[in-house]
Amino acid sequence: MHRCTISHIDPDSPLRHAAHPGDRLVSINGNPITDVLDYKYYAYDPQLAVCLRRPDGSEHTVHIVKPLGGELGLDFETYLMDNAHSCANHCVFCFIDQMPPGMRPTLYFKDDDARLSFLMGNYMTLTNLSEREVQRIIDLHISPINVSVHATDPELRAFLLGNPRAGKTLE
């Protein structure tokens, strides 16, 4: 799977004649698309230059006009368009670690992903965020993000989350 690979085009999509399943979404109005947040943010405008890459590597740009906020009608191989960020903590209270064995595998995935927090309401601890990701959250106005704090004392927070970096996250 390649990042941002189109799996389906809605029949009413403004790209229905230009995009095909298997194409990759490269950029919108010159902004590289790396995941679902870029896609939703940059596709909001009514006038778009959409760059697509065919499976053979050739690229072409399609200029479209659509209603402000109107959907492009593209589905991708995965919802986030890349892998979810997994949790690096070892929390003493982790509910996933307390689940019984034998349940479906997706229930055991520990995410700590700002995108899933914003889009799905999941909680995150902020211990996974790089400075670049924090800046991106600010630049794209990604809000709200649900933060699981548990403690503000750095030493106690590091202990509870089982992660020495957790104490520095709230600085």
Specify the residue positions occupied by each region the protein language model found.
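Conserved PDZ fold ligand-binding element
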Residues: 16-34
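Short secondary-structure capping/turn segments at boundaries of alpha-helices and beta-strands
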Residues: 36-40, 134
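Conserved Radical SAM active-site core
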Residues: 59, 66-171
